[in-house]
């Protein structure tokens, strides 16, 4: 080491390392004295005047840093690059290293002269700036180049204390640019190369660093020798000082200032030489080092006072460049020697090293013993020959320096760049190598043009450096010795780069004032060396970059003198132990440097539009530059501070963002998993923290769970119940399939993950983790695996419990549920999240009575300050508030409160309160209960888009309190408040918690309801239950999931009990003739007594009956299509025998149900299910016939029925008020219902035809289809009471005959009933008889059947029964209503008829519209919870039936049987709307259903008008 350093120094000055250090110290002292600057100025000025064009760019950089440094850099680089600073800068940047060596040699004489000239030229301004404008001049300069920083810092010292900091900064920045932008950039790049090399030196070994230092010394000897001599002569320093500068320049690889001065020229050239002739220049530089070292000593001598000031500067800069300044100046000189042999540039560096020696140990070490060591240190700090400030900046700028590397890549100022710079600064030698690799096209360009010029300059500089070196050898030897001692102290203080840097920073801070003075004194010499270094760095980085660096460095030096000095002082204290910290701190400076480098790199790319050249004059005008620099420097200082903080951050750049992101979204998990699998080290750490924190997100496989079964289906996958194999804990796995995701991970899943990870509340579902179904990320990617969101398991959801009929919630339970629900919602809203999908199936309940809000797939962040549109197609229709229905897009959290209000009503009524299948129908239902939206109650409603297009048919007054009188007063107040039409008047979740109903509720202290512990009641289970009942309790459909909507449409297969209930619409249509017939027949509305008699005679008389004959006997008008279908159907004798009675009763039932428009297929279906397919065919035929018969009857009976309904609706409505779930036994319930209902209805409807209302336990789950929506149902309980089905029976002219027939049928059906019960679980006769009362209770709730409307049939079905009533004959409608009720809930037929007059037709029409094939609704769609109370279900006739008119709604009982369309339709409107159903009466709407009508199919939707809703 010493020998190498000696060689470097000795090469320059023939002095021992200690002597050189002494010389450098002496020089620094001299620099400290203000006398030298005047000398330098006269010398530099004339020469600078010669290369003024090139100097301006350098000056621009130099002036901010230090005018003298800029001048030196300008002189050094301008002599070479004067013609084209920008281009040269690019070239230099490209050819940082090799040109460095070459340029150093070339610079030797010529470069030295030019450097001196530039120094002279720049010195005056540095002095001008330096005297008072050091901040501007000095500030700009240091930013530019690390190598130049030493010389520039010297210049800055010459400039003055303030300018010293600035000059130190500018020295790095401007010094490098001093010769020209190109030269400065080249110098910067060289400095970067040197910096990088020092890093590599660190990485490699002290040997490498020694070699590189030697090379740097050699190169710097040549380069900085000439440059330093030139710079000194330019600066007006004595020949000895010049010689010393040259020596120190050669030793400036260890010493910072000469590096910057001579390094400006020689470092730029040396960098090019390094890049181009790295090895050659090494050998050559090994030869040259003596002169270079000799010259650097002069530079050091000249810079000696500068080095001190520079050290101060560098120290002050050390936080940014300061660390590197002290270490870098020393290290830079060493690194330059070792790397570039930018030691010539390091000639200035040697003074820096001397100054740095003030962070002395590092500097002296680096210089004398550890050129290699220092190169390692230089890796951290002295990458550039110039002092740390310039070298560090360059370093950071240089691709090899932390900043440089970064700059080579991105040159971002981010802490990440500083992080990168850390690693690079760690290995400066490697940096220098990487520097070569990092040579960018711009660098190459600099190499080509700038390298040549630099080589020429190097020669001139070498000559000058040789001259100056000889003269300055003596002085520089002393200065070098001093600098070496100081550097050794600094390096010792900060053995690691960081330590050196920090020590240097602290020392530089302390010495910065001195350095500023020295820079003022030494400003002239330092610019020459600084110019060399800067020119190298200028090569490395364009002048613009240099200018930015200078600006940043100036301010940063000033600010960071304090900051970095502070940091460096503690660092110096901790230096060796803190080497890691030092690394981070150097990284911080390098980070600042990187950012500067990045700017410089950007500038390099932007060299053509070099703003710096124009600014070079500004640099000459140090004040303007200073202002710019100060601003930039302040920014960079701030950035540096931030960078320091960032550098201190433990996480890699990706972690902060990736951590949360990867953690929260499964996507990121997937990425993390994939990455971790692919790159476990990278991904593991990146996402590992997250995964570890979040239970190894994505690392766990779904195999960790035992999947027990499917419990639900979401928008993007199934939900499974599973057990954790490790803990035994029950969990819910929500599957997220990526198979069909063209856009990648489903946005709903992303939203849910992101939001749920931000929500932690006892009333909000907890997402535990995310797992995949692939253990290997590659397999996952190949096979498009699935993600599983792991949630805590909840035993039930509210919908499943309400539909199951297994649970009764009392007021306390409802209070507890609502309290928990509103607490969770209030938490969401306070977190500014809108749930936007609150419904019963998304409210989960465990066996402990805890409520949790789930399914945040539609949730989104809500900004109350920002009014921006959101989609209004959110929230399930039944729970959608009126503002969304009217097109509001700037909604508020009030939308969720409305949904909760609907749930509150549903908890009391056991059914959805607003069940429509279309938005217009939903708004109509809301208007009937809550009043029509109007400006009087809702002033802003007129602003809504659909206010004029979605107006209800009529204006309704608000009668919510009247409709829900049965609700406790406190609950009713809250209910009324939550269902305010005007969202601004609606209560908030927080206000709801303060209301009387919920104020004092403590759910934890309230006993949970008696929940079915043996059965988990989920929506999917409930739907399956409905289907099973529809399928005749077969398990075939158990696996099939029917959406709640479909169920509500009339998928209530529990009534149909025929597997056909599940058939697709097309099949259902075709089969309705044969297979569906039994269903239709079962629930078929009662025919006229004469018709029934005829049918009975026909069926009994013939062993087999052709349906065509059957139609003829019944005098039914059939269209040709239906006739053909009937011809194909023959009723087997067996069917007649077994199903004869069933058919007969079913026929009357069909007739009544058809007239009612309700669907009562379940009764017939039950018997038929047991019977053969032939029976089904017979029933389908009967359904068709009966539909047509009923159509005719309905037209006649409509009026009578309407009248009777009006008459009878009065008494039956109260009966219907009965609690819906109560019918425990079909018999008893029937009796009660019969008593409540007119016994006429019972008489009218044969007992066999009447479905029994089974106890909730025995009843099949309510089909999704709500019971026929009767007016009772719509009216909820009140109106249900008002709409008795008996009136329709009274109206029926053939009421007596029908009653007799019904009795006969009932007698026959009792036998069939068991079959029906088997299929439907409802004894038709018994259940049906009580249907009137149940209809009040269940009918109302069921007819409102929430699920029907979800399909869209619900509301229409409700309307349909009303219309059907009016449309269909009263008696028919009554029976239909009764029967439909039976089918839907097996309620007494009479009740249904009461509603069905008006409603039946509407139901039929509604069903037709909803179901393309026919208006019939599926009872399976009905909610079972409502099924019990539902009265008669109106049977919708097949829309297919051409003859199907409004009256024909009941003619297709078969189809209706399958799906209980009537019942579903009635329920769909919702209880309240059905209650209003009387108003809905539009008899014309109820169309007859053709045989082909399929209840399952939403044929009603196809019908278009058959909704049965008045609107």
Curated annotation (Swiss-Prot):
One of its GO terms (biological process) is positive regulation of transcription elongation by RNA polymerase II. It is found in: Nucleus speckle. Residues 49-58, 1253-1269 have a biased composition (Pro residues). The modification N6-acetyllysine is found at residue 557. There is a cross-link at residues 520, 548 (Glycyl lysine isopeptide (Lys-Gly) (interchain with G-Cter in SUMO2)). Residues 491-511, 1144-1166 have a biased composition (Polar residues). Residues 129-140 have a biased composition (Gly residues). The keyword Membrane does not apply. SUPFAM superfamilies: Protein kinase-like (PK-like). Transmembrane segments: none annotated. Residues 705-998 form the Protein kinase domain. GO terms for cellular component: cyclin K-CDK13 complex; cytosol; Golgi apparatus; nuclear cyclin-dependent protein kinase holoenzyme complex; nuclear speck. ATP binds at residues 711-719, 734. Residues 189-198, 295-309, 512-523, 564-585, 660-670, 1197-1209, 1233-1252 have a biased composition (Basic and acidic residues). Gene3D superfamilies: Phosphorylase Kinase, domain 1 (3.30.200.20), Transferase(Phosphotransferase) domain 1 (1.10.510.10). InterPro entries: CDK, Kinase-like_dom_sf, Prot_kinase_dom, Protein_kinase_ATP_BS, Ser/Thr_kinase_AS. Residues 92-109, 210-220, 419-436 have a biased composition (Basic residues). Residues 160-171, 246-269, 384-402, 463-490 have a biased composition (Low complexity). Interacts with C1QBP. Interacts with CCNK, CCNL1 and CCNL2. Belongs to the protein kinase superfamily. CMGC Ser/Thr protein kinase family. CDC2/CDKX subfamily. This is Cyclin-dependent kinase 13. The lineage of its organism: Eukaryota, Metazoa, Chordata, Craniata, Vertebrata.
